[in-house]
């Protein structure tokens, strides 16, 4: 793969975004219901049955302490001063998300991660582990055989490893023991929260709800929260189901450019135009001139006068040149020009950062 391949993909994606129309979306895809959320759970446990790849107990005293405590609870007392040398046990942290409306007896997935110096959790079995919430209450119990996505092997001082061996998952490995109370059907109102705050989209959602269920049903509180007053003579759950399936055409959000500083990935959500600026970046030279063009129809033809923008792009690769960008130039043109001369994604990242600092980039710049 050449270095210009990522920028070519960026150019194609930018053109595709501009060509796609803004279609209507369901309210359930644009909003969440306040109070309907998952809850994070965490627990400490032991994984046994490892093939000599567990914790080195001399370096992880908490593993030995956990084993001794577990055996004492089972009625097995070890002699004082016993030095356990175990290689098939590993101390782990178990995490999971308790889904909304989960009831006792329902299964949930959990992730098991080594917290000691175990070389691999492959082939291990998680012993019964209580999972607690932020309130220190037990909401689920986890136990089961781990599934590890990686693989590793070694001999004569040489080893190789594919993917990560220190963490794995147990599908349906936890059983819910306690439900989180929900007040969704008890409150007099329902609050919808837009996933992306936008006053125009909030207004459109309110209009769609009021048009379907009557004026006064929905009221915007701000650019994100919408308060809904369900009718008293219908089932609350059926009302929410019908409400979530209403179609709304969201407004176009603000222009945004996302940069990944580690990989050089650049993503644009729409057309981005630039103000006048000049940038010198290494040996890159890009000059883009944009001029208005008027399309005048013939006399009595019934056509309309249309104003368009004509861009002329000149590309050079000479040391110490200046990148000149006139007002109205699109970011897509800049990407295409840089792609044509073999610039790397890191070059594009540096140039966009300079444009934003100079105030010529008409978009929110986010670096991840």
From Swiss-Prot:
The keyword Signal applies. This is Flagellar P-ring protein. It comes from the Bacteria. It holds the Pfam family FlgI. The basal body constitutes a major portion of the flagellar organelle and consists of four rings (L,P,S, and M) mounted on a central rod. Residues 1-24 form the signal peptide. Belongs to the FlgI family. GO terms for molecular function: structural molecule activity. NCBIfam families: PRK05303.1. Keywords: Bacterial flagellum, Periplasm, Signal. One of its GO terms (biological process) is bacterial-type flagellum-dependent cell motility. The keyword Signal applies. GO terms for cellular component: bacterial-type flagellum basal body, distal rod, P ring; outer membrane-bounded periplasmic space. It is found in: Periplasm; Bacterial flagellum basal body. Its main location: periplasm. Assembles around the rod to form the L-ring and probably protects the motor/basal body from shearing forces during rotation.
